[in-house]
Amino acid sequence: MSTIAAFYGGKSILITGATGFLGKVLMEKLFRTSPDLKVIYILVRPKAGQTLQQRVFQILDSKLFEKVKEVCPNVHEKIRAIYADLNQNDFAISKEDMQELLSCTNIIFHCAATVRFDDTLRHAVQLNVTATRQLLLMASQMPKLEAFIHISTAYSNCNLKHIDEVIYPCPVEPKKIIDSLEWLDDAIIDEITPKLIRDWPNIYTYTKALGEMVVQQESRNLNIAIIRPSIVGATWQEPFPGWVDNINGPNGIIIATGKGFLRAIKATPMAVADVIPVDTVVNLMLAVGWYTAVHRPKSTLVYHITSGNMNPCNWHKMGVQVLATFEKIPFERPFRRPNANFTSNSFTSQYWNAVSHRAPAIIYDCYLRLTGRKPRMTKLMNRLLRTVSMLEYFINRSWEWSTYNTEMLMSELSPEDQRVFNFDVRQLNWLEYIENYVLGVKKYLLKEDMAGIPKAKQRLKRLRNIHYLFNTALFLIAWRLLIARSQMARNVWFFIVSFCYKFLSYFRASSTLKV
């Protein structure tokens, strides 16, 4: 039996961010491999009129948990939903619930965070820094706690080219920022934000770096580890390939490309697309939880889980495979034929944005106005391009992450644990993974039926023919206008026609002689 799976048996586990993508996959893996665990505490808020228990049932109703229900039929009884608001002091947890958490928790997986690149500094600091600090304070009062696993990001120090598995200091102490945000008004905060984040590309990466500093400073005598995943993507193997449930990161790009809205991106084609499957991240998290609790390292260890240094795939290769998959399994009702042009040149990027994005959106909105409908495409396109622009920093660069601790941990696992909790990204077949990724977006995000593929292919063929006809008509009109205005253009045109006529005459004469 797996040593790691046995370790989590009988444990009480606290997961923050359990309703998010990573948190759901973590819960699924825990229940599937360690169905005899005692309880999983999840911190949630009522949402859209739902009670806490209704939110739990909604999570378990997902296809993701189908296998879990077979091995752990009473799974809903092992999830203890606790009302909490990470924006409030002490998370607004009731005294009774707090007492239960403090007295029973064995393992903490801190996954909660705001991942918005354009979030306000106040909100991002509250969730990514202050909440982490408060959770560490809670952890220090848990007598049965064995390990605290903090999930950060590989891009927390993206202002560096080479990133080691260490915690880097930030220019300003987290405590000073937390204290200053309590009395500064929003206008002043917005004004000083660019000066604070300095070389970091956005507030998200900056506050995740601050969060790591807080972990280091507030660790006390706790057994703590930090995990830094890169771009978290769809499942690779477990519980099945291609599962995804949000439109963040690559998922939104795949949808926008497959629907024909996004046809050109400012990106360096040969830059590494450092995508890491979510189940690989979860397997490392569980292995790190076991290792931290059992071996009790003297210092806080940092683990990188990235693909670029072990099994790199560049954006060009990924784009080619995504388009090839769209040919086989296209999305339904695309706006235009899917395409993906990568360019690192700013002028070329602006040209493609004007020709491939804004112009079609304006034309379509004119059509909507003429037919008495409300124009919406230009607004949607502007929002899409604004979102893509926030990703440009990451798709135009490559980083080097050291993975000494991750490789060390892999070597510490038994063959059975390496199989059950596989986080060896060197085994990943990118072509197969990308195809399953696109298929998963179609099935689980867009909720499109596979039976509709033949009809979608017909529509794609129709759009391709329209594209060719439009380009041909545009060329002929432009050429006709050019001929009418330029003697040189007329001479070139007559030369081409004359040459073609002579070539055809020669070919016909040659055929006659052979006969």
From Swiss-Prot:
Keywords: Lipid biosynthesis, Lipid metabolism, Membrane, NADP, Oxidoreductase, Peroxisome, Transmembrane, Transmembrane helix. This is Fatty acyl-CoA reductase 2. One of its GO terms (biological process) is long-chain fatty-acyl-CoA metabolic process. The gene is FAR2. SUPFAM superfamilies: NAD(P)-binding Rossmann-fold domains (SSF51735). It holds the Pfam family Sterile. InterPro entries: FAR, FAR_C, Far_NAD-bd, NAD(P)-bd_dom_sf. GO terms for molecular function: alcohol-forming long-chain fatty acyl-CoA reductase activity; alcohol-forming very long-chain fatty acyl-CoA reductase activity; oxidoreductase activity. One of its GO terms (cellular component) is peroxisome. It comes from Homo sapiens (Human). Catalyzes the reduction of saturated but not unsaturated C16 or C18 fatty acyl-CoA to fatty alcohols (FAls). A lower activity can be observed with shorter fatty acyl-CoA substrates. Can produce very long-chain and ultra long-chain FAls, regardless of whether they have a straight or branched chain. Involved in the production of ether lipids/plasmalogens and wax monoesters whose synthesis requires FAls as substrates. The chain crosses the membrane at residues 465-484.
